[in-house]
Amino acid sequence: MKQKFDIITSTCVPLPLESVDTDQIIPARFLKATTREEKFFGDNLFRDWRYHPDGSLNNDFVLNNPLYGGEILVAGKNFGSGSSREHAAWAIAGYGFRVVVSSFFADIHKNNELNNFVLPVVVSEGFLQELFDSIYANPQMQVEVNLPEQTITNQATGKSEHFEINAYKKHCLMNGLDDIDFLVESKDKIEAWENVSR
């Protein structure tokens, strides 16, 4: 879903597991759908962790724990590894997450998140661990993600870190533009350049 991104302040969902791959994010059996049906993919985010094989709810999994919720997923190192399926980003966005925080993302998945209006924020290992500690100490603790300033702040500790983002992707997120929207927005500039170049 296209949404302009500025500053998000939210509680967080902690997932302190390393190397969460795209098959765990959205299992392969749900890839038959080739259009972005947000509710379908969101409902099946982390499907094999959220439910037991018999279809009953796994109450031990964090998404089923009423203590935790919000628009920010805080995940362990190497998030989104494995296959390049864009469906994984569709599932994350479809569930309602607008930010994923980790100390490292698989490159293709990171780009897929950006293309689907989810902001991947890379932080240091130390900052990530402090986030987990703060969330577990107080599930209502909030984190502020400021895209214009490119900062993330743990409001429990007051500590902030700067994060990097490609300037083009930042522009698109802040203005709610996908790649096609950007080309349309830039039409006059492109035509002017073509006229000068002839």
Name the predicted role of every residue range:
Residues M1-G76, G80-R198:
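Cytosolic catalytic domains that perform sulfur/thiol-centered chemistry
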